UniProtKB/Swiss-Prot annotation:
One of its GO terms (cellular component) is cytoplasm. PANTHER family: LIM AND SENESCENT CELL ANTIGEN-LIKE-CONTAINING DOMAIN PROTEIN, LIM DOMAIN-CONTAINING PROTEIN. This is LIM and senescent cell antigen-like-containing domain protein 3. The lineage of its organism: Eukaryota, Metazoa, Chordata, Craniata, Vertebrata. Detected in testis. It comes from Homo sapiens (Human). Residues 70-117 form the LIM zinc-binding domain.
Length: 117
């Protein structure tokens, strides 16, 4: 099978760096230099960047799915994507639903601790 009119992909050596002379002769069709990994380390950094971007997307996707099925412990309603959520001992609440168990007053913003009597 011949690739007429198409350039072959470059083979990157595994155990040594590409000589500078070879890099200077590699140009794209528009006259700019081709972006190729020069060493294993550079390839590794590129792989890490792609992996991190994939992980960030996957984490956001999973968080969106988790919030879609999460419900408030008090009102049993769902959560909006940009809504503030209070997590107390693994139970999720809307900010306005998280109230004192004795007087049912909302807490001012900040950290809270349970007092055991």
């Amino acid at each position: 099978m011949a690739f007429s009119g198409r350039a072959r992909p470059c083979i990157i050596p595994e155990n040594e760096e590409i000589p500078r002379a070879a890099l200077n002769t590699v140009h794209e069709a528009n006259g700019t230099e081709d972006e190729r990994a020069v060493s294993k380390l550079q390839r590794r950094h590129s792989d890490v960047k792609v992996y991190k971007e994939f992980c960030d997307f996957y984490a956001k996707f999973n968080m969106a799915n988790a919030l879609a099925s999460a419900t408030c412990e008090r009102c049993k309603g769902g959560f909006a994507p940009a809504e503030t959520i209070v997590n107390s001992n693994g139970e999720l609440y809307h900010e306005q639903c998280f109230v004192c168990a004795q007087c049912f007053q909302q807490f001012p913003e900040g950290l809270f601790y349970e007092e055991r009597t």
